[in-house]
C-alpha cells in the first residue's frame, strides 16, 4: 500500500482550508451532503435511462451516524460510488485553474471565503477543517470491486477493500467533540440542506425513562429523517414563505447571502414546466470568465439532468441561479437536443421574458434595489444588446446610464422625457472613465445648449452603443456625430491655412486637422472618422489578441477662436512645438497617455520661458 502525495495545489488548498477558514467550519457538512446528493442524482439518472441500471433495487438516501467513543462522524449515501481512477482524479488532484481561481478570490472574510468552497467544487477538502483523518469507502453499482481512500491531509492511500453495497461512506476522525452532538448536526442540516431532494437520516440519542421507580433512564440510539426532502419548486407558492425561498437559494448556490430577487413560475398548457430563478446579491466569482459555470439546474419530471448546460439561459443572464423542471423532455436529453429541441427553446424564451419582466418591475417600483442589481450585473446585462438579440428592446429598457447633468443613473425613457421639443436625438459619449468623459471638450457645445448626454463609461459601451441605433423611435447618436455647423461663424482662409500647417507638423500623428464646429473653450479635441475605431475600441481589440492592427490615426479639431490659435496665426515661429503641444493636450483631455512625456515637458517649458 504505497502512500501517494497530493499535488502541490491540493496541499496549498488544504493549508488554506485548515488555517484560514476555521471560524466557519460547520460548512463541511453542507459540502459532504451536497456531494452525496450529486452522487444520488447521477445514479438516479442512470437508473431511469440505462437498461443495465434499471434492474437495480435501492433506496436513495443519505445517512449520518456518530461514534462518540471513537470520535467519528460517518456520512453514507447509496449513490453512484467511485472506482480507483475516480478516487485519484476526484480526491487526489484538483483542476489547477480551479484552485488558482479559488485562492485568488479569498478575501480574508471567513464567511465570504467559505461560500467559495462549494462554488469552486473543492468542498470535500473542507472536512479537514474538523477532522485529522478521513477514510472513504466506495463501490460502484454493477461492480464487484470496492476501494478505500485514506488521508491525514499530508498524503493519501488508495487500496482495494470490502463493501457489501454500492455507494460511498465517508468517515471523519474528528479533532474535537463539537460535531458529535446530534442536535448541533440536526440544526446544521436544516440550515443548509433541508431541501436536498433525498432523505437525510441522522443518528440521534433518545432518552428512555425507566419503568421502575427510583431507577434512572437511559439513552438509546435511533435513526430518523431530519430534512424535508421535497422539491421546493414543485410546492404551491401559497405554501411557501420568503424564508423558504432564501434557504433553498443558499442550498443550491453555496451563497450565505439572501438573494436580491426570486421568481417562481408554474406553466400549464401545451407545455408544462416549473421554473424557480434567483438573482444573487453578490457577484458569482466567475461572472466575467469565459468558462463560467451555469447557475441553473435542469430537471425532467423532478429527475436531475444537468447543472452544466449554458444553453438554458443566454450568456447575458449568467448571473441567474435556479431550477428549470420540464414535464415533457426525454430523460436522456443531450446537449444537442437542448440546443435544438422546440420545447426547450419555448421554455428558454419564456424564462428570459419572465426574468426581464420581473427586473423591469423592480426598476419601476424599487429604485434603490434596482440600482444595487445594476451595479452588480449591469455590465453583463448589456451584453444582450450585442448582435441580433430578440430581447434587445426589453434589455434596453433595463439599462441605466450616468447623466451629464446630474451624475445620477437614468434610463432612456427618463432621458426622452426631459428632452426639449426641438431635440430630436439621444446623445451619448463613451470610451473612458466617467470623470474624463464628463469633462471632455466634446461636451462643451452640449453643456452650452443644456443638452443632456449619457455618460457611457463601461468598457462594453464602446462596442454596443453604436449598434443600438434607436430607442422608442428616437435615434441614438455619439456626440462625435452631432452636427452644430449652423452655430459657427465663417471659416477664414487664415483658419484653413493654420490648420494645414499644424497638419504638416503632425503628419505622422494625425489623419487630418480641421477647424472645429463644436469647441467653445478647449484648444483642441481628437475625433475619429465614423468607420475608424477610437482609442477605447483599439484597446479592446488588443485585449482580444488583435495585436497587429493597422495604425488608425485620429483627426485633430482645433478651436479657431482660442487665444493660442489666434496668436499662432500671427506668429508661427514656434509652430512645430506648439502643434505637438496641442496634440498632446488633446490626448491628455481624452484620458490617453502621450507618446513622449519628456518631449512634451521640454516643449511646454521652452514655450513658457519665452512667454515670461
From Swiss-Prot:
Residues 540-612 are annotated as: C. One of its GO terms (cellular component) is cytoplasm. Its main location: cytoplasm. SMART domains: HATPase_c. InterPro entries: HATPase_C_sf, Heat_shock_protein_90_CS, HSP90_C, Hsp90_fam, Hsp90_N, Ribosomal_Su5_D2-typ_SF. Keywords: ATP-binding, Chaperone, Cytoplasm, Nucleotide-binding, Stress response. Residues 336-539 are annotated as: B. One of its GO terms (molecular function) is unfolded protein binding. Residues 1-335 are annotated as: A. It is found in: Cytoplasm. Homodimer. HAMAP family: HSP90. Molecular chaperone. Has ATPase activity. Belongs to the heat shock protein 90 family. This is Chaperone protein HtpG. The lineage of its organism: Bacteria, Pseudomonadati, Campylobacterota, Epsilonproteobacteria, Campylobacterales. The gene is htpG.
Amino acid at each position: 500500500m504505497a502512500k501517494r502525495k497530493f499535488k502541490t495545489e491540493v496541499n496549498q488548498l488544504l493549508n488554506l482550508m485548515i488555517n484560514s477558514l476555521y471560524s466557519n467550519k460547520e460548512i463541511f457538512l453542507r459540502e459532504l451532503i451536497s456531494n452525496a446528493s450529486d452522487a444520488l442524482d447521477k445514479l438516479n439518472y442512470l437508473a431511469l435511462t440505462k437498461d443495465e441500471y434499471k434492474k437495480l433495487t435501492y433506496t436513495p438516501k443519505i445517512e449520518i451516524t456518530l461514534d462518540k467513543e471513537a470520535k467519528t462522524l460517518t456520512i453514507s449515501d447509496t449513490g453512484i460510488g467511485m472506482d480507483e481512477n475516480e478516487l485519484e482524479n476526484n480526491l487526489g488532484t484538483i483542476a489547477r485553474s480551479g484552485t488558482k481561481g479559488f485562492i485568488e478570490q479569498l478575501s480574508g472574510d471567513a464567511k465570504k471565503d467559505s461560500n467559495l468552497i462549494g462554488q469552486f467544487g473543492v468542498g470535500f477538502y473542507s472536512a479537514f477543517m474538523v477532522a485529522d483523518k478521513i477514510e472513504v469507502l466506495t463501490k460502484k453499482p454493477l461492480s464487484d470491486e470496492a476501494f478505500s481512500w485514506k488521508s491525514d491531509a499530508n498524503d493519501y492511500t488508495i487500496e482495494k477493500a470490502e463493501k457489501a453495497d454500492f455507494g460511498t461512506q465517508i468517515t471523519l476522525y474528528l479533532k474535537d467533540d463539537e460535531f458529535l452532538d446530534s442536535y448541533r448536526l440536526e440544526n446544521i442540516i436544516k440550515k443548509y440542506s433541508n431541501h436536498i431532494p433525498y432523505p437525510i437520516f441522522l443518528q440521534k440519542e433518545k432518552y428512555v425513562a425507566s419503568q421502575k421507580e427510583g431507577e434512572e433512564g437511559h439513552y438509546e440510539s435511533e435513526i430518523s429523517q431530519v430534512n424535508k426532502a421535497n422539491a421546493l419548486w414543485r410546492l404551491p407558492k401559497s405554501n411557501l414563505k420568503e424564508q423558504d425561498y432564501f434557504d433553498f437559494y443558499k442550498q443550491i448556490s453555496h451563497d450565505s447571502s439572501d438573494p436580491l430577487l426570486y421568481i417562481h413560475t408554474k406553466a400549464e398548457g401545451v407545455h408544462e414546466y416549473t421554473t424557480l430563478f434567483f438573482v444573487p446579491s453578490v457577484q458569482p466569482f466567475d461572472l466575467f470568465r469565459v468558462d463560467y459555470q451555469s447557475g441553473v439546474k435542469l430537471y425532467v419530471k423532478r429527475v436531475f439532468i444537468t447543472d452544466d448546460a449554458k444553453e438554458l439561459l443566454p450568456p447575458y443572464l449568467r448571473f441567474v441561479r435556479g431550477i428549470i423542471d420540464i414535464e415533457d423532455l426525454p430523460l436522456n436529453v443531450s446537449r444537442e437536443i437542448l440546443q435544438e429541441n422546440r420545447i426547450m427553446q419555448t421554455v428558454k424564451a419564456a424564462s428570459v421574458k419572465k426574468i426581464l419582466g420581473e427586473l423591469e418591475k423592480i426598476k419601476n417600483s424599487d429604485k434603490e434595489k434596482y440600482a444595487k442589481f445594476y451595479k452588480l450585473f449591469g455590465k453583463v446585462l448589456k451584453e444582450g444588446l450585442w448582435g441580433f438579440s430578440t430581447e434587445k428592446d426589453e434589455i434596453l429598457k433595463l439599462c441605466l446610464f450616468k447623466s451629464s447633468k446630474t451624475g445620477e443613473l437614468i434610463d432612456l425613457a427618463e432621458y426622452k422625457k426631459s428632452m426639449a421639443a426641438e431635440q430630436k436625438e439621444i446623445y451619448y459619449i463613451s470610451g473612458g472613465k466617467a470623470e474624463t468623459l464628463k469633462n471632455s471638450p466634446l461636451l462643451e457645445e452640449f453643456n452650452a445648449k443644456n443638452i443632456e448626454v449619457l455618460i457611457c463609461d463601461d468598457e462594453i459601451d464602446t462596442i454596443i452603443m453604436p449598434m443600438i441605433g434607436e430607442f422608442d423611435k428616437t435615434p441614438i447618436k455619439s456626440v462625435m456625430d452631432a452636427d452644430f455647423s449652423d452655430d459657427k461663424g465663417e471659416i477664414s482662409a487664415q483658419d484653413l491655412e493654420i490648420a494645414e500647417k499644424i497638419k504638416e507638423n503632425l503628419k505622422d500623428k494625425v489623419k487630418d486637422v480641421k477647424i472645429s464646429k463644436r469647441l467653445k473653450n478647449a484648444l483642441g479635441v481628437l475625433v475619429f472618422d465614423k468607420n475608424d475605431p477610437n482609442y477605447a475600441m483599439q484597446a479592446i481589440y488588443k485585449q482580444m489578441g488583435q495585436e497587429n492592427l493597422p495604425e488608425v490615426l485620429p483627426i485633430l479639431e482645433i478651436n479657431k477662436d482660442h487665444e493660442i490659435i489666434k496668436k499662432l496665426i500671427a506668429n508661427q515661429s514656434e509652430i512645430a512645438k506648439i502643434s505637438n503641444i496641442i496634440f498632446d493636450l488633446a490626448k491628455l483631455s481624452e484620458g490617453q497617455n502621450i507618446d513622449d512625456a519628456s518631449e512634451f515637458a521640454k516643449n511646454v517649458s521652452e514655450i513658457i520661458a519665452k512667454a515670461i
